[in-house]
Each structure stands twice: as structure tokens, then as C-alpha cells.
């Protein structure tokens, strides 16, 4: 899935997968009142993104390359502490739906378009009822209703710390978000081997 996401505070329609990455960067910069070189794009560090990265570098904008976790990369656009303005690139469609669900909870814009590598994938999409193979899906189409997003870190990442094994317990870090209230809860869990023990 091609993915394009920005956090809250931008005018509706500031991003559009039908436009080039450079045009999207320029639109985001104009909405922010800065030069394109002041925009930071988060991109999954994969060979398939070589042309995208080259285009962004030619434009002069900053690039934050991540090794994995494009859901966390999309969520990063909502966190002012990351300084990331936009997420761009291709990744799995299920992850696109998860990222859209998180953005529904905290605000932002997301667009996704299915990418097909071969005729078998196109045929499978047709069997699932996908008739427009070039359709651009918007946030509300991918995550509608009273969305609740929950994630727990398994390994350390940019969004959550991974599972830590201690002498008498295991600790976890989770986030739970709800669209209807905009509530975000960060949960640090202690899972004890025996009741009454502490970490």
C-alpha cells in the first residue's frame, strides 16, 4: 500500500496521493508557512524507496529513515517532539489500516492506495470485491466508527519499549487510543511471576 500521512492542524486535503511527493512536500510547507527544506519526511528504509528518497533529497527536505515499524512512523507525525511532518512510502496494507486507526484517534490525515506486484495479487483483490485498483482510500474509509487502537511493544521501537525480563517480573509498555474521546493512555505493565511481588 502507498501511504501518505500528516498529523493534526493542517487544512483538509493538504496531502494527495495523486500528486508527486515533491508537490505534497510543497503543499505541507505552504500550509506550515515554511520552506520545503524545513519539512521532515519519515520514510521506511527499503530499496523500493530509493527513487522517493532521491526526490526528497533533491527537494532539500529532511528525511528520517526508519528500519521498520511504519505504523509507528505514521503515528510519529502526530507527536511534536519527533519533528516529523509527513510519512511517505509503501508498506503492508494491514499496517496501513492500523496506522489509519491510530490517526483517527488522535487527528491527522491519511491516504492509502493498494499496490499490486503481479496478476495474482490483482486477481485476489478482485475476488475480495476490489474493482478500482487505483482507488485512493481516505482515513475514514480505512478506519470508521468508534475506533480503538491498542499496541504493545514486543521489541524496542520509536513508539514503545519492548518486553523486558527482570528477575521477578516482566514489564511491558502499551498505548491505547480511542477516537470518540481522543483519549490516549500509555500503560506500563508489570507482570509478576507470583502475586504480591514487585519488580
Language model region names:
Residues 1-199:
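IMPase-like, lithium-sensitive Mg2+-dependent phosphomonoesterase catalytic core
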